[in-house]
């Protein structure tokens, strides 16, 4: 399979340049505690309809112990939730 183009290349954003921290995200998103899936927003490009955010993952996440014990992997449903929260913030 040929390589795919990036939606946004990692060189286009800086994870250290926080546009919105957790406190700003909370002004727009209602999720709290275990359901907060964003730590910060680091890039917005309204002309391209793009927004980049991230979540700091720790050993204390509720899913780490069981998904999967030897090699924790963020569950797909949590990835979808993170994308939904990013979309909710951006719109």
Question: What are the language-model segments listed below?
Answer:
Residues 41, 73-91:
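Active-site helix/loop of acyl-thioester processing domains in fatty-acid/polyketide metabolism
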Residues 1-73:
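Non-catalytic linker/capping segments at the edges of enzyme domains
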């Amino acid at each position: 399979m040929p390589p795919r183009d990036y939606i946004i290349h990692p060189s286009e954003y800086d994870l250290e340049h926080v546009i919105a921290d957790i406190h700003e995200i909370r002004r727009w998103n209602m999720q709290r505690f275990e359901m907060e899936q964003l730590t910060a927003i680091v890039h917005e490009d309204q002309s391209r309809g793009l927004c980049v955010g991230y979540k700091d993952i720790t050993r204390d996440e509720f899913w780490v112990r069981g998904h999967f014990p030897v090699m924790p992997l963020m569950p797909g449903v949590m990835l979808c939730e993170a994308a939904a929260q990013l979309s909710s913030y951006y719109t």
